[in-house]
Amino acid sequence: MRGSIVLLPVVGLFGASAAWAADVDLTELKASSPVPYYSAPSWSVVGSVAPTFTDNALFSRDNRKSDFYYEPDVSVRLDGNLTNDLSYRLYARAQYEAFAREKDGNAAVARVGARLTENWDGWRFSAIYENRYDFDGVYRDLAFTSHDVMGSVARDFRMNNVTLSPLLLVTYRFSDLAEARRWRFDALLGIEVKLDPKWSIVSTPLFEAFWFTDGLNRGRQDQIYSADLGVKYNFTSNVSLTTSVVYEARASNVAVRRYRDLRIGPRLDFAF
């Protein structure tokens, strides 16, 4: 999530930033997997907990401050099928980041959404709607409300012990805050190399591009580049621990929005 978190309090010279980019993180990538056919809809709870060190808590170009933060992320989902190839998902998701020292970096998101996915010859085509609430602080002050309309295409390629999972996503954000309205393009590649039934090497290189369309941010263009490497251990089929190192950089035609960030930490993923 932190991949594109924006400093929500900053609605000054250039308005609000891009908002939690890594909504398309490894968890979301897995969430794009095909829904098995069920005769009746099924409920699930999916989430993660991640204590993390960052060397740039406030996404600053010039005033870098290191800190530790805690990030829980929980979703409740209802999955079902309309046909053998057409599945749907209704979900509610809450996540936040709480810093040990740099409290200005605290932020939270709550959202509800729906996704419709067509499976065609191994490819997954999805249409997604999300009603999103971004908060300054840990659910302290509502910063803005958004309606995200998304389309994605994804597929898994398996070769022996290697799984490659490319995903492309296009989003337009409607928002009550003019500076938050924008187009967004995501391209990522999930990589998993199984060493044995329990251990894997994982990585999710990511590229994101933002084109802001309104308010003081009109004309602003950002690009985020992210690379990571991690080791994953599966306790069971639905509980795993991944420890990873992530490097991220943002380029922008607004110089003050450029930054670099290094993050290190474990993440516990679960699904029930």
Located regions from the model:
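Outer-membrane beta-barrel biogenesis signature
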Residues: 20-44
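Transmembrane beta-barrel domains of outer membrane proteins
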Residues: 34, 75-79, 113-119, 130, ...
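Outer-membrane beta-barrel channels and translocator barrels
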Residues: 40, 81-85, 117-123, 154-160, ...
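Residues that define the transmembrane beta-barrel architecture of outer-membrane proteins
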Residues: 41, 66-72, 104-110, 143-149, ...
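Transmembrane beta-strands of outer-membrane beta-barrel proteins
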Residues: 43-49, 88-92, 110, 123-127, ...
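Transmembrane beta-strands of outer-membrane beta-barrel pores
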Residues: 49-57, 94-100, 120-122, 131-137, ...
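Surface-exposed strand-loop-strand hairpins of Gram-negative outer-membrane beta-barrel proteins
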Residues: 51-75, 100
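Outer-membrane beta-barrel "beta-signal"
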Residues: 232-234, 240, 259-272
